[in-house]
Amino acid sequence: MRATVLSLFWMVTLVIIVRAQIPESHDEQTILSLPLFPADIVRNHIPLTQALGAVGASVEGGFALFGLELHSTDGQEPIVSVDLPPESRFEDGLRQVMGQIPGYEYEVTSEHMINIYPRGAKKNPADLLNTPVPKFDAVDVDPGGVLTRPADFIPELALRLRPKTSAGPQPSGYGGSVLRSNVTITLHLKDTTVRQILNAASEAMEQLPQEYQPVGWTYLFQPDPESLIGGKHSWAFLFSAPRNWKQHSAKPGPNA
C-alpha cells in the first residue's frame, strides 16, 4: 500500500514539473520558437525599436509584431545592442533585448503579437492604454491612422487627453508617420481597452496584400507633473515584419 502511494506521489509530481515547462499558450510556443536568419545578427548601440525591428525582420517561417509601451523621463528610447549567432531563435533575440531594459516585461497576446510594457503597467488603471472602451466600431479605416492617431478614433481616449480646464479635446504628443495606402480595415470590439484596440488594428493588417507589410505600434509616455494630462503622449509605427511575411500568414487548412 505504501509503495502504491509513493508511486502515485511521484507520478503527480512528475506531471506538475512537466507542465511547468510547457509555454503558457500555443501561440507563445509557436512564435518564440521561430528560427532567425542563419547568420550572425549584430547591431550595436541602437534605439530599442530598431533592435526589435532587426530581430523581427530576421524571422523565418513566420513573423512577429510588437506593441511597445515606453515610459521615458527624457522622451528618448533605451539604447540596446543585438548580438545573435547563427541558429538563434526568435526567443533568443527577444530575451537578449529584454535583458537590457530592466523593469519591463513582455507578453505574447496572439499568434503574431507581442506586447512589451513597464512591469505592472497592464494592471494600472491610471495607464492610458488601459482606458476602458465599452464599444469600438471602425469601418473602412486606415490602420495607420488608428495606430498613430488613436484619439481620433477612440472618444474615450480623447477624453482622457483633454485637459480639465479645456472645453474641447486637445490630444498631446504627435501622430507619427502616416501609412500612405489605399487599404482599409474594419474593427468591431466590445468591452475592450485602448491597448487591445491597437493590437487588433495591427493584427487586422495580416489580411492586407503582400506589398503592405503589417506594422506594430509604439506608445511613448514622457511624464510631466506640470502637465494637465500627466505628460506627453506619442504614438508611432514599429516595423518588424520580414518582406516575405505573407508567405507565412495564411493558416493551413484541415487537409494540409
Language-model regions, residue ranges each:
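N-terminal targeting/assembly segments of extracytoplasmic apparatus and virion spike/baseplate proteins
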Residues: 2-5, 9-256
